[in-house]
Regions:
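N-terminal export leaders
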Residues: 4-8
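Beta-alpha junction/loop-to-helix N-cap segments that form part of ligand/metal-binding clefts
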Residues: 46-53, 66-136, 144, 205-214, ...
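Extracellular/periplasmic Venus flytrap/periplasmic-binding protein
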Residues: 89, 140-250, 293, 297
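Extracellular/periplasmic periplasmic-binding protein-like sensory domains
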Residues: 247-327, 338-341, 395-422
């Protein structure tokens, strides 16, 4: 039997631990935990690290104005390291151990698909800030990036137009995973509907982290000998750097073979001599070069944040589309929490419908009433010598997302509201 003195000691210790526990949980309740889940290492770090940085800046901005529901937001940053199964583990950790009220994260669709069952099982909320292939509408995700009809389809329509070079043949080049393959399936069906034959469509995929583009670029040149050709690039991550370097090495100019990219923005061009790429294209819903007061403040705030926090290459930081979508998403979530009066996922989900926010893209963006996607303007930009983009085409107003593409058979029977996807 335990001696009486030991018992008293043990009881005193457990009482201290319990009271410490209460103090900790009370302290934790003074803040609202917010998960930030982006790859800060591995092949996707080039693209995802700035999303973590802009998320922290946005949280600081909200906290400086008093936080949400009178509480400060407390960021919890995790690094899933471009490792797709690790994303699911980190998501579970954020929701169960860290008790995050919401998570802002992911870039690749394979990372989003990895975490989706976790968010649906635990009824967590994920804000996903990157353009993607559609074919998904989860009640546990808000998609603040573009669906194919808000990026891919308009970009290819532009390439086929006189202004875009009247392309007749299409070289679809992507990283080998769900986003490029599904997007290209949609684009192939779209091109068929416009009378483009399979012989005039080439599809090539490379692994994540791929760097030897010599043969592929040489094949693009051969394919282009058969008629006016455009390249549609869904290459993701740091592979973009060697791809664009190889285009320059082989003397491919935008006037000969235009390349439109869906995952290359200002950040990916930071490490490249952009002079040989002048005139090449990217389709997004925001560019840093957009001239309006809201964007001027967003860009200035981020530059100041980078300097104050000694971010790597702070003197040359840029903003881009997924950063803007992250910024908009965090602000919309904060507004929805204020409206709901709670961080409860079901109540916040309901409060998100119809939320609006004046975005740096120059438009007041609306979260759709039913489909969990943002209405977004579509823009096509040309690379300039300084690594920025000049907008050469854009819609005159935001476009409603079509997560279920009409170019995929059977989609017309799918509901226009979220349904759990994970089994």
């Amino acid at each position: 039997m335990m001696k009486r003195r030991s018992l008293i000691k043990a009881f005193a210790l457990s009482a201290t631990v319990v009271s410490m526990g209460f103090a900790w949980s009370a302290q934790a309740a003074d803040t609202i935990k917010v998960g930030i889940m982006h790859s800060l290492s591995g092949t996707m770090a080039i693209s995802e690290t700035p999303l973590k940085d802009v998320a922290l800046m946005t949280i600081d901005e909200i906290n400086a104005k008093g936080g949400v529901l009178g509480k400060k937001l407390e960021p919890v940053v995790v690094d899933p390291a471009s490792n797709w199964p690790l994303f699911a583990e980190k998501a579970r950790q954020l929701l169960t151990q860290d008790k995050a009220a919401v998570v802002f994260g992911c870039w690749t669709s394979v990372s989003r698909k990895s975490v989706l069952p976790v968010f649906e099982e635990l009824n967590g909320l994920l804000f996903y800030p990157v353009q993607y292939e559609g074919e998904e509408m989860s009640p546990n995700v808000f998609y603040t990036g573009a669906a194919p009809n808000q990026q891919a389809i308009p970009a290819v329509e532009y390439l086929m137009s006189e202004d875009g070079g009247s392309a007749k043949r299409f070289f679809l080049l992507g990283t080998d995973y769900v986003y490029p393959r599904t997007t290209n399936k949609i684009l192939r069906a779209f091109l068929h509907s416009k009378g483009v034959a399979d012989k005039d469509i080439e599809e090539v995929y490379t692994p994540f982290g791929y760097s030897d583009y010599q043969t592929i670029v040489s094949n693009i040149k051969k394919f282009a000998a058969g008629g006016k050709t455009a390249v549609v690039s869904t290459i993701n991550g740091d592979s973009n750097v060697p791809f664009y370097k190889e285009l320059a090495n082989q003397g491919i100019k935008a006037t000969d073979i235009p390349v439109v990219a869906f995952s290359v923005g200002e950040e990916e061009l930071r490490g490249i001599d952009t002079k040989p790429l002048v005139g090449q294209l990217a389709a997004w819903n925001y560019f840093e070069s957009i001239d309006n007061p809201t964007n001027a403040k967003f860009v200035a705030d981020y530059r100041a944040y980078a300097k104050a926090h000694n971010l790597p290459n702070a003197a040359t930081v840029v903003t881009n589309d997924p950063m803007e979508a992250t910024y908009v998403g965090i602000h919309m979530w904060a507004q929805a929490v204020e409206k709901a009066g709670t961080t409860d996922a079901d109540k916040v989900r309901a409060a998100m419908a119809g939320q609006t926010f004046k975005a740096p893209d120059g438009f007041t963006l609306t979260m759709d009433q039913t489909n969990h996607h943002l209405h977004k303007p579509v823009m096509i930009g040309e690379v300039e010598e300084n690594g920025q983009f000049s907008v050469v085409w854009q819609t005159d107003k935001p476009v409603r997302a079509q997560p279920w593409s009409p170019y995929i058979a059977g989609n017309n029977k799918k509901p226009d509201h979220p349904v759990k996807t994970a089994q």
